């Protein structure tokens, strides 16, 4: 340290002018041989050189700012030097390149969870039907019926994920997305038929009261049902799997906040919906367990069994009504409930060089896949800008409003000339 200080004082005394010291970034960093000749400590990879010749110095700005050093490839550190964490964080993978692979992995995890849930639902639904039949309990069988609705929903979700990877054919140019809607209609109709049969039996038991229930089997089956639904809740719960991976960027980076920060553990709506259904099943199973406990220890209150059937039938009807309504809207090619046609028209009219929006038709191929056909008239004299208008309208429909497909027809505005139909003239008095 003493030798280094003496060297600095000697260099200051020998300076020809009062110009400030500067770093010479035009020389290579590896000067270990020169350092040894001058008696300085050797640097393995880097040595800062103090230049005396003012001609080598960068031009000093008049405003007193720090001089800007020009980039020089020769001034980089040797490759075997370890990089710091901040240097490593600047190497960012493009989110656009990995988003497709990430989506595939996400769908694979969703399919695995839903498949396991479907298998458990199927096995226990069969077990409940057998247990309810042996125990002569309509409440147990109604609980199995409610589980059938959840099983159908999971199967439809898996079907939708499978169909999304299928390409359209020459006959089915839109693909096979409507198959999901058809399957939903069939499954709901099957549930309603079974529910009608159970309600009829419940009414007969309420009127005649000539039936016996095996309280032990009913209690065991109901207890297993609660346990299975708790397991389903843990299986489908995603709160413990949320973790955000963000690509590290410096705070002043122009790309920060521009979409490179993603939540890689984003929840799946399909799994979340199945989790909500599992919670509903858990509540219903607890109700069946309470009824089984009452019937087991108080057989004279066996009326609790048909009462549970009435309550759970209403619950099944309530949960399936939305499916029926959405299916009818899709079949009739109605506008999806989350889209507003007037608002979309206003947004299209705000595009530059758009004169009017003549036709706007919106419908759904299936749940979550909306399609639009729009006819736009351009301002007279702006036909040369049709590509720009089409690009903006396409981006608005697909990205802003989340359309699955859209078709845009462009036409220059032409004032209509009143023409009287010859048939109308001949028929008029």
Swiss-Prot record:
Residues 240-264 are annotated as: Zinc binding. It is found in: Endosome membrane; Late endosome membrane; Lysosome membrane. Residues 135-143, 200-216, 296-310 are lumenal. Keywords: Antiport, Endosome, Ion transport, Lysosome, Membrane, Metal-binding, Transmembrane, Transmembrane helix, Transport, Zinc, Zinc transport. One of its GO terms (biological process) is zinc ion transmembrane transport. Gene3D superfamilies: Cation efflux protein transmembrane domain (1.20.1510.10). Its main location: membrane. Residues 1-113, 165-178, 238-274, 332-429 are cytoplasmic. It is a multi-pass membrane protein. The keyword Transmembrane helix applies. The keyword Chaperone does not apply. Homodimerization through dityrosine bonds is stimulated by oxidative stress. Zn(2+) binds at residues 146, 150, 277, 281. The chain crosses the membrane at residues 114-134, 144-164, 179-199, 217-237, 275-295, 311-331. One of its GO terms (molecular function) is antiporter activity. It catalyses: Zn(2+)(in) + 2 H(+)(out) = Zn(2+)(out) + 2 H(+)(in). Probable proton-coupled zinc ion antiporter mediating zinc import from cytoplasm potentially into the endocytic compartment. Controls zinc deposition in milk. This is Probable proton-coupled zinc antiporter SLC30A4. It comes from Homo sapiens.
């Amino acid at each position: 340290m003493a030798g280094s200080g003496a060297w600095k004082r000697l260099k200051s005394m020998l300076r020809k002018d009062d110009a400030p010291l500067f770093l010479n970034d035009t020389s290579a960093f590896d000067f270990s041989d020169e350092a040894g000749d001058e008696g300085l400590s050797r640097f393995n990879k880097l040595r800062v050189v103090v230049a005396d010749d003012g001609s080598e110095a960068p031009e000093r700005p008049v405003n007193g700012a720090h001089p800007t050093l020009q980039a020089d490839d020769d001034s980089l550190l040797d490759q075997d030097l370890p990089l710091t964490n901040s240097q490593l964080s600047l190497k960012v993978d493009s989110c656009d390149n990995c988003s497709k692979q990430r989506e595939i992995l996400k769908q694979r995890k969703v399919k695995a969870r839903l498949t396991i849930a479907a298998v458990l639902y199927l096995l226990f639904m069969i077990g409940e039907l057998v247990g309810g039949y042996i125990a002569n309990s309509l409440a147990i069988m109604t609980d199995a019926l409610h589980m059938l609705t959840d099983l159908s929903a999971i199967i439809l979700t898996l079907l939708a994920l499978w169909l999304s990877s299928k390409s359209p054919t020459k006959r089915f140019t839109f693909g096979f997305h409507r198959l999901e809607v058809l399957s939903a209609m069939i499954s709901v109709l099957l549930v309603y038929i079974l529910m009608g049969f159970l309600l009829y039996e419940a009414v007969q038991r309420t009127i005649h009261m000539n039936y016996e229930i095996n309280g032990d089997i009913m209690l065991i089956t109901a207890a297993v049902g609660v346990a299975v639904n708790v397991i389903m809740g843990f299986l489908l719960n995603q709160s413990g799997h949320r973790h955000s991976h963000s690509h590290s960027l410096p705070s002043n980076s122009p790309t920060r906040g521009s979409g490179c920060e993603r939540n890689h553990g984003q929840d799946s709506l399909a799994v979340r919906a199945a989790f909500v259904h599992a919670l509903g099943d858990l509540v219903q199973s607890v109700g069946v367990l309470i009824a089984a406990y009452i019937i087991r220890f108080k057989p004279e209150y066996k009326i609790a069994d048909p009462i549970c059937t009435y309550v759970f039938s209403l619950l099944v009807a309530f949960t399936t009504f939305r499916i029926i309504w959405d299916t009818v809207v899709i079949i009739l090619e109605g506008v999806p409930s989350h889209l507003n046609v007037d608002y979309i028209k206003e947004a299209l009219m705000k595009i530059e060089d758009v004169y009017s929006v003549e036709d706007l038709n919106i419908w759904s191929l299936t749940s979550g896949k909306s399609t639009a056909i729009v006819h736009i008239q351009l301002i007279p004299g702006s036909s040369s800008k049709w590509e720009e208008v089409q690009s903006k309208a396409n981006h608005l429909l697909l990205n802003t409003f989340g359309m699955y497909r859209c078709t845009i027809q462009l036409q220059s505005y032409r004032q209509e000339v009143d023409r009287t139909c010859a048939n109308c003239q001949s028929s008029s008095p």
